[in-house]
């Protein structure tokens, strides 16, 4: 008999989504669902004594591997790429209307509430609410012109979010001197 087989990233994410889903009522509002996901990821609670947290050893995400979801799942320490991506992946598996949005050199989550309005969620800050005025204060280079142009603070489509993920992966390929980065660019 060999070593026990570890679940793939996909099955691990599916298992996490099932675990979160069991924590809130079937007919719960979107608000209850997103609050439950926040508590699950960033706790702490008795079932999750070691919640996911910001990686203070690499706060700027300079080590490319630290931007990868696989690293975040393994270490439970992430940054402004891996943390919102996990939140969005699990949220979408749960049917919660969440997506990625951007600020200068930063990603965070947008959640569409029961009232149809979008709300910011800052995964790097324990899943706290992060409305646009708060984000504007955090990023002095976030100009009204850039916001008006739609470059920042707009909910991204799935395709735009995929581009953000690919950008992180290309950095990983390049860091490991892999020719897969060139192949990936060609396929895009």
Briefly describe each language-model feature range.
Residues 1-188:
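A structural boundary/capping signal
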């Amino acid at each position: 008999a060999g070593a026990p087989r570890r679940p793939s990233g996909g099955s691990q994410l599916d298992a996490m989504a099932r675990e979160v889903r069991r924590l809130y009522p079937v007919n719960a509002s979107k608000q209850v669902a997103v609050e439950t996901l926040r508590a699950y990821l960033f706790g702490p609670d008795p079932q999750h004594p070691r919640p996911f947290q910001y990686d203070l050893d690499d706060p700027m995400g300079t080590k490319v591997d630290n931007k990868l979801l696989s690293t975040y799942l393994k270490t439970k320490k992430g940054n402004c790429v891996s943390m919102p991506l996990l939140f969005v992946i699990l949220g979408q598996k749960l049917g919660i209307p969440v997506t990625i949005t951007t600020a200068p050199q930063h990603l965070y989550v947008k959640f569409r509430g029961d009232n149809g309005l979008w709300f910011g969620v800052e995964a790097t800050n324990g899943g706290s609410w992060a409305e646009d005025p708060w984000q504007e204060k955090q990023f002095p280079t976030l100009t009204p012109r850039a916001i008006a142009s739609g470059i920042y603070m707009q909910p991204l489509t799935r395709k735009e979010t995929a581009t953000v993920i690919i950008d992180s992966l290309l950095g990983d390929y390049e860091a490991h001197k892999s020719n897969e980065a060139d192949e990936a660019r060609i396929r895009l």
